[in-house]
Amino acid sequence: MWTARRILKDLADGDHRRKILTAFWRFGDEQMKAVAIVQLARAMHFRDETIRKMAPEKKAELLAGRVGSPEFEQTFENALMLYHTHEQSEMLGAFLDQWGVPHKNGSIEVDDYTPPAVDAVREAVRKLDAYDRRDVAIYLAAAGLLMTGAWRDATWPVVDELAPALRPA
């Protein structure tokens, strides 16, 4: 099972983890960020205001230090979503085009579409080999996590195939 914490620990290297968690602080809504600030302050015995004043990159670094903490799972899920929709929309669009899923800049904006089957996911990974394999694995794991159901059934087996070669050092 690919949780947000597992994706960040097992698939993302330090650079990807930093980019993903920085995206949370740059693109997240104020309520999401406020919850994360309170959680970080509590976990680190800091005042909320101390964390609030930090640069997004520093707050991302603090979050990265909590990647094993279950109480941050929702924050990490939001970070993955924000990273992909803001920083990886071109790659999302390329995969969605391969699967015939209507989208706008990588964001699915309709309810009436058929999620890809596992063979279609494998074929898209093969065809779109110009994209970094780590980026692809993180995307597919996050898609299965965030979209659930048929998406999970189609993407996670492919992530399981890609993951052994991507374990961070």
State where each predicted segment sits.
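N-terminal low-hydrophobic presequence detector
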Residues: M1, F95-Q98, A169
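Short, charged, intrinsically disordered terminal tails
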Residues: A163-A169
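Short, aromatic- and cysteine-enriched interfacial helices/patches
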Residues: W2, R6-L11, M54, V101, ...
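Charged, amphipathic alpha-helical stretches
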Residues: M1-V35
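Acidic, low-complexity, intrinsically disordered interaction modules
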Residues: A23-D153
